A protein has these predicted regions:
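Gram-positive cell-envelope targeting signals
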Residues: 1-3
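N-terminal mature-domain "stem" immediately C-terminal to a signal peptide or N-terminal signal-anchor/transmembrane
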Residues: 5-7
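Proline/serine/threonine-rich low-complexity linkers at boundaries of modular beta-sandwich domains
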Residues: 35-55
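Basic K/R-rich, polyanion-interacting modules in nucleoproteins and related proteins
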Residues: 48-69
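A near-ubiquitous, low-amplitude feature marking generic local secondary-structure context
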Residues: 59, 96-99
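Short beta-strand segments within Ig-like beta-sandwich modules, predominantly Fibronectin type-III
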Residues: 99-107
Length: 286
């Protein structure tokens, strides 16, 4: 019978030594994305420390790192120590997203706003609260662009929605990570409230520090997903791992994506990944 593959079947070894596996994986920490963001990060930090920006007139940047169009960064200073909470007002019942900024009471504020609607002038409320309980609120209007076609055309169906029984109804979103294209998140009524413009494959995990790990690729035209990115929901990249394309299995042909389907954080914050190691079999090595 004819093979259904378009490539020659290889005769890889059944088992490899640890040293050969490490050589095949060729894991490296790279800084391409971090380096490209340094100027923006410095700009936002300076804005948060500048007396030019206040709660009544803050610095606002939608999509601050160019990869998270339904997020925004709001920065300002206050004369007193305050804690800050934001609310993205929902379009339907119990879909408003409210979060309090980590860091407690301070005078310099960088507020990561997540959960905007696409192609909408969103209403966002920023509330500063003093230790004595005095509050001040600023209402912002943040305009976003339309969804990209691969998300816009995705079929999202909700039925029998009972928000009283759903954690999603308490300021949380459900992340949808498909075989390819952009990962996105929806609220209890199925509205898209976050997405990342980086293409992702199978793997997107929440880390204990609030960051997310996304298996992506250098650009949308690349064949393989061999960039593992530690990022946040605003799109800032904190660490990036690169892998070699030397691990295709016997039946894998040109498929040289290293990590497949799973990634887990350990208590010491190292992580384990399921990978193909270049042996006869695939997706069977941690």
């Amino acid at each position: 019978t004819k093979s259904r593959s378009n490539y020659a079947i290889k005769n890889n070894q059944v088992a490899l030594s640890d040293s050969q596996i490490k050589k095949n994986l060729d894991t490296k920490i790279i800084t391409t994305r971090q380096d490209s963001q340094k100027a923006a990060t410095a700009k936002y930090k300076a804005a948060a420390e500048s007396s030019k920006y206040t709660l009544t007139s803050p610095y606002v940047k939608v999509n601050p790192y160019g990869t998270s169009p339904l997020s925004a960064l709001v920065t300002f200073k206050t004369s007193n120590n305050v804690k800050v909470t934001y609310t993205v007002v929902g379009k339907t019942a119990k879909t408003s997203i409210t979060n309090t900024v980590k860091g407690g009471y301070t005078t310099s504020h960088q507020v990561p706003v997540v959960g905007l609607y696409a192609d909408t002038t969103n209403t966002v409320k920023i509330t500063a609260t003093t230790k004595a309980g005095k509050t001040q609120t600023k209402t912002l209007k943040l305009k976003t662009s339309a969804l990209p076609k691969y998300i816009k055309n995705a079929t999202i169906t909700t039925k029998n929605v009972d928000k009283t029984k759903m954690a999603i109804g308490k300021n949380k979103l459900t992340v949808i990570n498909r075989t390819t294209k952009q990962p996105f998140a929806i609220d209890a009524d199925g509205a898209v409230r976050w997405y990342d413009t980086n293409y992702s494959q199978h793997t997107i995990e929440q880390w204990s520090n609030g960051h997310i790990m996304i298996l992506s690729k250098k650009n949308q035209n690349s064949d393989v997903y061999n960039d593992l990115i530690e990022t946040d929901y605003l799109g800032r990249v904190y660490k990036e791992y690169g892998f070699a394309n030397k691990t295709s299995s016997t039946d894998g042909g040109v498929e040289t994506t290293v990590i497949h389907h799973d990634l887990v954080e350990l208590p010491n914050h190292n992580f384990l990944a399921t990978v193909s190691d270049g042996s006869k079999y695939k997706e069977d090595t941690l």
